[in-house]
Amino acid sequence: MRINPTTSXPGVSTLEEKTLGRITQIIGPVLDVAFPPGKMPNINNSLXVKGRDTVGQQINVTCXVQQLLGNNRVRAVAMSATDGLMRGMEVIDTGAPLSVPVGGSTLGRIFNVLGEPVDNLGPVDTRTTSPIHRSAPAFIQLDTKLSIFETGIKVVDLLAPYRRGGKIGLFGGAGVGKTVLIMELINNIAKAHGGVSVFGGVGERTREGNDLYMEMKESGVINEQNIAESKVALVYGQMNEPPGARMRVGLTALTMAEYFRDVNEQDVLLFIDNISRFVQAGSEVSALLGRMPSAVGYQPTLSTEMGSLQERITSTKEGSITSIQAVYVPADDLTDPAPATTFAHLDATTVLSRGLAAKGIYPAVDPLDSTSTMLQPRIVGEEHYETAQRVKQTSQRYKELQDIIAILGLDELSEEDRLTVARARKIERFLSQPFFVAEVFTGSPGKYVGLAETIRGFQLILSGELDGLPEQAFYLVGNIDEATAKAMNLEVESKLKK
């Protein structure tokens, strides 16, 4: 991180110290640039191309140096369209990697990969900037304590708890509630932990990015009246951007998150949607640079690129970055190099199920498919572990019995199995929860449920103490006391109807 001086020293031009080169070749988003002998830029240095095209329009393209070719030439990848560039144009070596604004001024705003605001809300304070290429924290700075990151969402905290400073893979198709879950996590971390969030849209559809922004404004995650009160910064590199931009936009978002962790000493939530598109962009860049492809056509540097991003996402003694990454699995093949490389870095997986979403169970997190390395008795404690295992066993037994129920009906089951089914259906409904950010749609006030309350609720259902309550009493409530109160209300309503 560096503080930019507000003014230059009198009479000193910043360009006088810069090295000038010239474009010698343009192949799509890749430029070859020749520099004077002994004035070669370093790898990852940012180069600026400024000039006018054939019709006199201003061109301003930023590139990042990727290869040193010899004969005083470098190969750079452009971060924006190269339309209008010509051989012989002047290129300025900025002498440093790409730097982006960081700090409180980024909250509530939308940025591109270069750290430029793209939301038409005016300029951003750029006095504090940070380079996007940095090394991961040293071992001595890391926080080795294994601690749970409480989200206030029952199904996540009980069955697939997140690790503070961990990495979570979010698997979900279109329309199963991925965006709403992301927004609720952003909202809850801000309220419960006083933390902030950074959202990196890597290869996002522009429409989806716009929808997310609008929904965040509606739900109050972004405060339009007082933008500084917002809880999230957004960084987008859309699908129509060159691969260089899509490959680096994750680093821009991560750099903003690192500032909140290291300087403001906060717990930060970092969303990357979609980590597979980061890999895809890297593959395109690799091919453009002339590297030999590796397995399934991916870049040979896949593990290194993934590691350089993932290793920076960690807990230090100052604060933590907990990352939630959407993972696209090509053709549902988990052995594909892109998801396989991602899995090596994940601490937990949250799988969203279309079947649950169709039933109206939101969040539609699958209790059997979602996993976490944190769900161990020595980390979460015996009580939490036992409760989670019993919930999973009951849900699994219900899943096994569903075919029998569909063919023969409930009456053909044994007394024990009927009891299991009744409790499993209550558990399934109790795993749903009203969200703060969905209040507008559901009409129910949102609920944050602490871990102790969550465990107590499921223990009461499993013990049979609540067998007499109707199933619908457990649907879309917070803690178990609300379910009991709802059951009483339902009873009163049914008596009044009679």
Swiss-Prot record:
Coiled-coil region: none
Superkingdom, natural source: Eukaryota
Positions of ATP binding: 172-179
Root EC class: translocase
DNA repair listed as a keyword: no
Molecular function in Gene Ontology: ATP binding; ATP hydrolysis activity; proton-transporting ATP synthase activity, rotational mechanism
EC number assigned by the record: 7.1.2.2
Compartment(s) where it occurs, according to its Swiss-Prot or TrEMBL record: Plastid, Chloroplast thylakoid membrane
SMART domains noted in UniProt: AAA
Membrane-topology descriptor: Peripheral membrane protein
Keywords: ATP synthesis, ATP-binding, CF(1), Chloroplast, Hydrogen ion transport, Ion transport, Membrane, Nucleotide-binding, Plastid, Thylakoid, Translocase, Transport
Cellular component terms (Gene Ontology): chloroplast thylakoid membrane; mitochondrion; proton-transporting ATP synthase complex
Catalysed reaction, written as an equation: ATP + H2O + 4 H(+)(in) = ADP + phosphate + 5 H(+)(out)
One GO term of the biological process aspect: proton motive force-driven mitochondrial ATP synthesis
One Pfam entry name: ATP-synt_ab
Job of this protein: Produces ATP from ADP in the presence of a proton gradient across the membrane. The catalytic sites are hosted primarily by the beta subunits.
Family assignment from sequence similarity: Belongs to the ATPase alpha/beta chains family.
Subunit-structure text: F-type ATPases have 2 components, CF(1) - the catalytic core - and CF(0) - the membrane proton channel. CF(1) has five subunits: alpha(3), beta(3), gamma(1), delta(1), epsilon(1). CF(0) has four main subunits: a(1), b(1), b'(1) and c(9-12).
Protein name per the record: ATP synthase subunit beta, chloroplastic
Species per Swiss-Prot/TrEMBL record: Schisandra sphenanthera
Gene that this sequence comes from: atpB
